[in-house]
A protein has these predicted regions:
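Ser/Thr/Asn(+Pro)-rich, low-complexity disordered segments
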Residues: 25-348
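Bacterial Sec-dependent N-terminal signal peptides
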Residues: 1-33
Length: 350
């Protein structure tokens, strides 16, 4: 435990300083002062360490939110030269979840949380969207699309799924009979009801497509197939109802039809029902399950509790055995996923 405390404390220290410095520089709300080397907590219990990680995660989305829209920044503006205005729709969905947690744990008042999210939703109602689907990046001041790449300058169905995974949870959590929470629920409902999931089957094909743009059409040509972090996109598309929802055939004929969908092999003696050999990055077990409970969730392909548990156990065992002899890997330092490195933007950890 001592080793994991050291590794996590170092990560928390960096994130806390980042959140504190960015919040100060942007002159936005804060939930308290940032960390310093002199005052950072030491010798924390597991429970206290977990509390600290959770609170510092929330602070990124609260202290460093865009001052106009409230949406989440795309990583660090200073480190990655994105400029002051780039916000991310999918990351905002994660931030909505963090705000709900902060309200429940009394780090902020329920009313301030609801008002913060209402500002977000009002902004989104005027921002660019395409058949109800938002782009990956928006300008946080104007709501205009910022291209993610040359041809990716329109709708992003997967990022929109992450956004609404958070917003739908907010609509359930903020259930009070007052003007702020009623308006929040109604506005989330209006946005949700305008998402044309079935339009992204590209004229009725049995698969969902990730991107579409008015400038480039379907040029990205990226069908969403499993198994990866995109399960929630199909779940929400199926849940959308008769107007814009998709049929089970789209799930079975699209998502489940891939060379990397079924696995069935054992790794380190642990069976893996779905996905790439060794399971792939751990965010496959995270992103879709922020709002989707895997407990008891089964279909003809997998028990999703078993899938997530076993992928995680394989990930840990790989670090314990450390066949690549990477420095630091071991029983108290594991959890391989995507991460940032300043020199090359985004990398997958080994």
């Amino acid at each position: 435990m001592k080793q994991i405390t050291t590794w996590l404390a170092a990560g928390i220290f960096f994130l806390a300083i980042l959140a504190g410095e960015q919040a100060t520089a942007q002159k936005k709300r804060t939930t308290g002062s940032g960390f310093s080397a002199a005052t950072r907590p030491r010798n924390l219990s597991d429970s206290a360490l977990l509390d600290l990680v959770q609170k510092q995660t929330f602070r990124y989305f609260w202290d460093f939110a865009h001052p106009v829209s409230g949406l989440a920044r795309e990583r660090s503006n200073n480190s990655f030269s994105y400029g002051d205005e780039v916000v991310t729709t999918g990351g905002t969905g994660f931030g909505v979840m963090a705000v709900i947690v902060a309200s429940e744990r009394k780090w902020i008042t329920r009313d301030s949380a609801a008002r913060f999210l209402l500002k977000m939703v009002k902004f989104l109602s005027k921002a660019d969207s395409y058949h109800g689907v938002f782009p990956h990046w928006l300008n946080g001041a104007t709501g205009k699309t910022i291209p993610f790449s040359r041809k990716d300058d329109g709708a992003d169905l997967v990022e929109t799924s992450y956004l609404f995974q958070g917003l739908l949870c907010a609509a359930q959590y903020f259930d009070a009979d007052n003007d702020t929470e009623t308006s929040l629920r109604n506005r989330i409902g209006w946005l949700w009801n305008e998402i044309e999931w079935n339009w992204f089957t590209r004229d009725g094909r049995e698969v969902l497509y990730w991107h579409w743009s008015p400038n480039n059409g379907w040029a990205m040509n990226h069908p969403i197939r499993g198994y990866n972090e995109c399960l929630i996109t199909y779940v929400l598309a199926a849940a959308a109802g008769d107007r814009y929802g998709v049929s089970p055939a789209v799930y079975h004929g699209g998502w489940a039809q891939s060379d990397n969908f079924k696995n069935g092999k054992d790794f380190y003696g642990i069976p893996l029902p779905l996905g790439f050999d060794y399971g792939g990055p751990l965010f496959f077990s995270h992103y879709s399950f922020l709002g989707l409970d895997p407990s008891g969730l089964k279909d003809r392909y997998a028990d999703y509790w078993e899938q997530n548990r076993n992928q995680t156990l394989i990930n840990r065992e790989h670090c314990v055995r450390n066949p690549g002899h990477f420095k630091g890997y071991g029983p108290n330092c594991w959890g391989l996923t995507a991460r940032d490195r300043k020199s090359t933007r985004l990398n997958s950890s080994h």
